[in-house]
Amino acid sequence: FCHNQGKDSCSRGLRDKKTNAFRQTAFGVDMAGCPLEEKISEMHLAKTDGNFVGALAMAVVDNPMVAGTGHRICNDCMKSCIYQKQEPVNIPMGETRTLRDVLELPWGFEIYSLLTRWNLLNIRRPVPLAESGYKVLVVGLGPAGFTLSHHLMNDGHAVVAIDGAKIEPLDPRYSGVTP
């Protein structure tokens, strides 16, 4: 595991030893690592120890909307993996597998929801703030829109979010809620 040696380039980026600048891919893209600075190596360590709820708790500190990212959106962490000369670790798929393992538990959806709102590993804000009295409308529910909505809710604001596309309810086997 890379974080024990301070080489978790997937989180912090792959740097040139001489200039300390980010290395670049063959296409000229900086290998800057995870834009959220997610604790990826720590998450994998918890997962391999069999603690997949702990692994998810570690991931959602920096990326509470891991359900919408994972292998679907970003792979900057893979581009910066120190195992470039071999096959890089498929970090986004590991995130997704960890989330699925938790969602398949009894009360799995509730566990994930709880970790995104009340997470004791999140030292900056382990619990949501009190109600602020503000009401916010978020238009557009792409990755930025639903992440903004989440953070606004944790800041104590009442949030209504709309999107141009039809939004389907989550499968009842995951949410426990029958529409």
What are these regions (language model features)?
Residues 1-130:
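Ferredoxin-type iron-sulfur electron-transfer modules and their immediate structural context
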